[in-house]
């Protein structure tokens, strides 16, 4: 039975993270700590000999991915479908500013994967745009999981996207998506895609995904979730 390992790595810390400011798809840079976190995560994950590294185009994710690429000898490809959730009117606002402008709205957003800020995306929207990428990787990366290989495909992205994509791959009921909590900066998730015994090894529909690891890190420092 073929097993595909999928690692999803969140970017390192940004100043927006440190200041509890909502980024969404704003293109922010890693902080000094974030760059240290990216290197520490890269040193751990490079030992896994990634088969492929695909990154969001936003700088905080791409710079995190490049750190892994440099240490693993793998080029980094970019896919805009890995961008963070668009947060609409909330982008650039602090948590306190959002709470003052719309009391209770952040709680509703946390508790309902179908809910979106004005002008933004829900977690269901984010999963709908990112899930086809994994489908394509299963179809196109014929070496992924072949002959018992544990070499993972690594997606470097953002906490909101990783949670939404994980929930979708696991087939969780949408009402249960909020059980997947926040991730630390430069932390990662691992899923294993098991092809059914009677399934087609190249067919996405014949894969059952299992969660191996959630929110693992190299533990450079505590950070904002």
Curated annotation (Swiss-Prot):
Catalytic activity of the protein: (2R)-2-O-(alpha-D-glucopyranosyl)-3-phospho-glycerate + H2O = (2R)-2-O-(alpha-D-glucopyranosyl)-glycerate + phosphate
Binding residue positions for substrate: 10, 60, 158
InterPro entries linked: His_Pase_superF_clade-1, His_PPase_superfam, PG/BPGM_mutase_AS, PGM_Phosphatase
Active-site residues, Swiss-Prot/TrEMBL: 11, 84
Signal peptide: none
Class of the enzyme per the UniProt entry, highest EC level: hydrolase
SUPFAM superfamilies for the chain: Phosphoglycerate mutase-like
UniProt key word Hydrolase: yes
A Pfam family per the record: His_Phos_1
GO cellular component, one term: cytoplasm
Keyword Hydrolase part of the UniProt annotation: yes
UniProt EC number: 3.1.3.85
Molecular function per GO: phosphatase activity
Keyword field: Hydrolase
Function, as annotated: Involved in the biosynthesis of mycobacterial methylglucose lipopolysaccharides (MGLP). Catalyzes the dephosphorylation of glucosyl-3-phosphoglycerate (GPG) to glucosylglycerate.
Subunit: Homodimer.
Similarity section: Belongs to the phosphoglycerate mutase family.
Name of this protein: Glucosyl-3-phosphoglycerate phosphatase
Organism whose genome encodes this protein: Mycolicibacterium vanbaalenii (strain DSM 7251 / JCM 13017 / BCRC 16820 / KCTC 9966 / NRRL B-24157 / PYR-1) (Mycobacterium vanbaalenii)
């Amino acid at each position: 039975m073929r097993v595909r390992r999928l690692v999803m790595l969140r970017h390192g810390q940004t100043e927006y993270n440190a200041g509890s400011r909502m980024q969404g798809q704003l293109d922010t840079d890693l902080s000094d700590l974030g760059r240290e976190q990216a290197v520490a995560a890269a040193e751990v994950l490079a030992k896994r000999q990634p088969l492929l590294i695909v990154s969001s185009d936003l700088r905080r994710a791409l710079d995190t991915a490049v750190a892994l690429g440099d240490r693993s000898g793998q080029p980094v490809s970019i896919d805009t479908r890995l961008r963070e959730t668009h947060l609409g009117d909330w982008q650039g606002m602090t948590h306190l500013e959002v709470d003052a402008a719309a009391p209770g709205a952040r709680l509703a957003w946390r508790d309902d994967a179908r809910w979106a800020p004005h002008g933004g995306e829900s977690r269901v929207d984010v999963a709908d745009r990112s899930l086809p990428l994994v489908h394509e990787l299963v179809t196109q990366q014929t070496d992924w999981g072949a002959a018992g290989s544990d070499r993972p495909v690594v997606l470097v992205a953002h906490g909101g996207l990783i949670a939404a994509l994980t929930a979708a791959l696991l087939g969780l009921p949408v009402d249960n998506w909020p059980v997947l909590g926040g991730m630390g900066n430069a932390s990662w998730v691992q899923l294993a895609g098991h092809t059914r015994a009677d399934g087609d090894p190249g067919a996405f529909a014949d894969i059952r995904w299992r969660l191996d690891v959630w929110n693992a890190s190299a533990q450079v420092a505590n950070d904002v979730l």
